């Protein structure tokens, strides 16, 4: 195997068994390899001509281009050339030291052959070291040999294992990018330094675009200008002051894979800006900061004064005042005074607006990524000049895969918008304005799409818009009978129990639209799913949302939202003055119609937690808070909060009862026979309770005799909070938020006022806040008498009585009932069935023999939100949003 190996010295070929010259040559080569591992190529021996060494080094700098165009052919011809012409090993070694990747590969193969005969460990390590250098220049044969060495654990040490694994795992795309990046780096570094300053690289950017014959006369083409600006931003995006070869190669590889440095987006492309462009306000001198950022300077001075004034005194105050407990108490006090109806109104609106804002933010991020796409294509065009074998299609696929995050967040935001829109109050949603915004983003998102799938995206958008307009025709107030027929459903076909197929012209258009979706996904061997289809879904969702919101809009609102806001830009000064004047008048009228003192006190109370938070943190900074918010991902924060809100509300949906029918055939007499005193006497109460537990869940409507009602609990969180205040402040708050006791004058005609005036002398305070009381009642109901009106012993048995729990909403009804009134009530059998005086929750009540009708209605039903039907309606709306007019939910 060693017979073909040339001797390391020119004295003559030694016999193959002689190991000493070979070992000496291996050691010399290894030592020179370690010295020149990072250095650019140069002559390794001191007796060589320096000029020759320099020419060899400079010739080796663009050497990676040679294996780019004909690397495969050279590899295929390597065998025959060796057979025909024997090249001395010293000459191959000199070429390898000069940076020739082919020679480095041959030296590595030579040491691998030597490792089979003697000194396996030393020769294998030398071979791996040479193969690493060749693989770094994109030599495919060297990569294959490294993979074999890694599999056989030949020459693999703890120092080179990580590098060998990285080079062995590189794809063809990464290897091509590496070869092109090597050529660019040596053009940017003509002096062949180990590390180059960023400023020096920026000065040499122009040399990359120069042809072999030097700079071409005439204007520079726009494509070359874009490539030059792209290369400048790529170099200056590195945070280091000096860039080595490996750093530049890794940076280029990451960009080619779609991993873009964050500060690359923040760089300005305008080359004519002054030296202060791009600097933050903190980096500017005080004079320029005041001139350029006056608000920031004022805020910074205010923060400094607050910090100086508060650090000394507020530090010890924050240690003795339980601020967190106070914040929690005030928070729970506010929450305890809110009702379920308020949450049912407020939460869908919050979810809708937050998710809509998230959609807008994600769309803007998509627009930013479209700019990144343009820069990426500029870089690939630049790399193609140095590596024609670069797989641009695979590079674009990798870039698209690594930039799917804003699209995923956008689709999640769409889900929240779809589910919250049918639940939210349309009176609090500016549908016309949102429809115009949705239409605007439909057009702009389409314009930001890639041109690679333009035939499909253009046809898909036209089809979608046509289907949407045809679906809107039946709702147009104008009498266009012939046109409305185009949007009407011809007939429907049930598909299962929950889905209906609508046969219409828009339905056919949607079938064609789904076909176009499939064609877009089919591009590039179904890699077009995330390269073309997912980006187009942004345009699709905005278009669908605009159609849905247009159904809730008015013609006047659309005119106001489109033409009015366009004219608003031209009449901005006059409109601002008019709006300010109108707002001032309305604000003054609002204050005159309400109690000014009450509003101010309420505002102060609600702001207490915020004030405590600000003043107890000695190191609090407004600008720091703003910076932290800008650094965090607002979209992720919104999505996390929306998910938490929906999970919290899901428990109410799961437990909701709604307006269900209380029509069980179980009568009170049957219940008393099975679970009453007779059953207790036959067996015992425990056995009866176990047996009657099978009746749990029955929704019954029974008739009984009202015996009495009592208050079991009075909840007044406002009074509890006021009682903790000093006496004089508490009385003032009671009179501010409550009512004064009436005086006992002859003009009082109300019974309630007469009762209160008698308590005025006995009350501890001049005012009361009983209007905030919330009551819980217990009603005792007995079995009705017989049909003849006679009272039987069993019917008057108090052990058969049942107890009904009632909430504060039944207060007016219960206070008007009298003992012996015949009432009809609805409840659910649950709890201690089969025991004495079982307690059920009152769901509905009506009086059957009252002389006057109960106020405000004859039958009073417990207000319960039918959350399940509401969620069912939201699911139906979501299904129709995606599939109507092709399919619709039953």
Curated annotation (Swiss-Prot):
TM regions (residue ranges): 314-334, 340-360, 402-422, 427-447, 465-485, 496-516, 529-549, 563-583, 589-609, 632-652, 870-890
Residues that bear Phosphoserine: 32, 158
Compositionally biased intervals (Low complexity): 50-67
Record-linked Pfam families: WC-rich, WCOB, WEF-hand, WSLR
Tissue: Highly expressed in the developing lens.
Keywords (A to Z) from UniProt: Acetylation, Cytoplasmic vesicle, Endoplasmic reticulum, Glycoprotein, Membrane, Phosphoprotein, Transmembrane, Transmembrane helix
GO molecular function: ATPase binding; calcium-dependent protein binding; calmodulin binding; DNA-binding transcription factor binding; proteasome binding; protein carrier chaperone; ubiquitin protein ligase binding
Name recorded for this polypeptide: Wolframin
Natural source organism: Mus musculus
């Amino acid at each position: 195997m060693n017979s073909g190996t040339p001797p390391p010295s020119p004295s003559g070929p030694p016999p193959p068994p002689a190991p000493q010259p070979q070992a000496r040559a291996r050691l010399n080569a290894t030592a020179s390899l370690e010295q020149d591992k990072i250095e650019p190529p140069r002559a390794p021996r001191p007796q060589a001509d320096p000029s020759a060494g320099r020419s060899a080094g400079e010739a080796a700098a663009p050497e990676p281009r040679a294996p780019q165009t004909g690397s495969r052919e050279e590899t295929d011809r390597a065998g025959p050339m060796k057979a025909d012409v024997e090249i001395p090993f010293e000459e191959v070694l000199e070429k390898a030291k000069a940076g020739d990747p082919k020679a480095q590969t041959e030296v590595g193969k030579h040491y691998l052959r030597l490792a089979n005969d003697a000194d396996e460990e030393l020769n294998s390590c030398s071979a791996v070291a040479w193969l690493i250098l060749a693989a770094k220049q994109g030599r495919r044969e060297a990569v294959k040999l490294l993979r074999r060495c890694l599999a056989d654990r030949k020459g693999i040490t703890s120092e080179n294992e990580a590098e060998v694994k990285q080079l062995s795992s590189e794809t063809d795309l990464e290897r091509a990018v590496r070869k092109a990046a090597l050529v660019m780096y040596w053009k940017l570094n003509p002096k062949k330094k180990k590390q180059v300053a960023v400023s020096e690289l920026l000065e040499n950017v122009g040399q990359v675009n120069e042809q072999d014959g030097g700079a071409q006369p005439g204007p520079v083409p726009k494509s070359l200008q874009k490539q030059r600006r792209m290369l400048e931003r790529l170099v200056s995006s590195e945070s280091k002051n000096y860039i080595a070869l490996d750093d530049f190669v890794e940076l280029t590889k990451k960009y080619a894979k779609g991993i873009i440095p964050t500060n690359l987006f923040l760089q300005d492309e305008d080359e004519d800006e002054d030296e202060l462009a791009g600097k933050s306000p903190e980096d500017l001198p005080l004079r320029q900061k005041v001139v350029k950022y006056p608000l920031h300077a004022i805020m910074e001075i205010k923060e400094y004064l607050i910090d100086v004034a508060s650090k000394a005194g507020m530090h010890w105050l924050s240690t003795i005042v339980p601020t967190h407990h106070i914040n929690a108490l005030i928070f729970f006090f506010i929450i305890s005074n809110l009702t379920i109806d308020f949450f049912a109104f407020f939460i869908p609106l919050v979810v809708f607006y937050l998710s809509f804002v998230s959609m807008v933010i994600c769309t803007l991020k998509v627009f930013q990524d479209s700019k990144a796409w343009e820069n990426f294509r500029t870089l690939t065009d630049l790399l193609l000049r140095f590596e024609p074998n670069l797989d641009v299609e695979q590079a674009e696929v990798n870039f698209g895969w690594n930039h799917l995050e804003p699209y995923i967040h956008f689709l999640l935001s769409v889900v929240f918008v779809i589910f919250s829109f049918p639940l939210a109050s349309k009176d609090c949603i500016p549908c016309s304005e949102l429809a115009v915004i949705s239409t605007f983003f439909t057009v702009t998102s389409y314009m930001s799409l890639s041109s690679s799938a333009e035939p499909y995206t253009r046809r898909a958008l036209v089809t979608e818009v046509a289907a949407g307009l045809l679906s809107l025709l039946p709702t147009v107030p104008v009498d266009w009978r012939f046109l409305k027929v185009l949007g009407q459903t011809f007939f429907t076909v049930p598909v299962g129990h929950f889905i209906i197929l609508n046969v219409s012209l828009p339905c056919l258009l949607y079938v064609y639209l789904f076909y176009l979706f499939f064609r877009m996904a089919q591009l590039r061997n179904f890699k077009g799913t995330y390269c073309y289809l997912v980006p187009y879904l942004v345009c699709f969702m905005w278009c669908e949302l605009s159609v849905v919101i247009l159904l809730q809009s008015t013609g006047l609102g659309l005119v106001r939202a489109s033409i009015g806001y366009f004219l608003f830009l031209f009449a901005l000064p006059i409109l601002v003055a008019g709006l300010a004047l109108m707002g001032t008048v309305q604000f003054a009228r609002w204050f005159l119609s309400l109690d000014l003192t009450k509003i101010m006190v309420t505002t102060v109370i609600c702001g207490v937690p915020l004030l405590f938070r600000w003043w107890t943190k000695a190191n609090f900074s407004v600008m720091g808070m703003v910076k932290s918010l800008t650094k965090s991902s607002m979209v992720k924060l919104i999505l996390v909060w929306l998910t938490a809100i929906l999970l919290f509300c899901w428990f109410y949906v799961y437990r909701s009862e709604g307006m269900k029918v209380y029509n069980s055939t179980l009568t009170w007499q049957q219940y008393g026979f099975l679970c009453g005193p007779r059953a207790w006497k036959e067996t015992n109460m425990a056995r009866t309770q176990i047996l009657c537990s099978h009746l749990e869940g029955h929704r019954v409507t029974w008739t009984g005799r009202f015996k009495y009602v009592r208050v079991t609990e009075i909840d007044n969180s406002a009074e509890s909070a006021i009682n903790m205040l000093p006496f004089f402040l508490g009385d003032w708050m009671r009179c501010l938020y409550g009512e004064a006791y009436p005086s006992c004058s002859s003009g009082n005609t109300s019974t309630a006022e007469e009762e209160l005036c008698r308590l005025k002398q006995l009350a501890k305070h001049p005012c009361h806040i009983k209007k905030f009381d919330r009551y819980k009642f217990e009603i005792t109901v007995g079995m009705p008498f017989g049909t003849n009106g006679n009272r039987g012993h069993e019917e008057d048995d108090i052990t058969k009585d049942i107890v009904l729990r009632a909430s504060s909403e039944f207060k007016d009804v219960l206070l008007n009932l009298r003992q012996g009134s015949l009432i009809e009530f609805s409840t659910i059998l649950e709890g201690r069935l089969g025991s004495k005086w079982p307690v059920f929750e009152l769901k509905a009540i009506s009086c059957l023999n009252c002389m006057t009708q109960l106020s405000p209605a004859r039958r009073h039903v417990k207000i319960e939100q039918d959350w399940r039907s509401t969620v069912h309606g939201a699911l139906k709306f979501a299904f129709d949003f995606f599939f109507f007019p092709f399919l619709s939910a039953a």
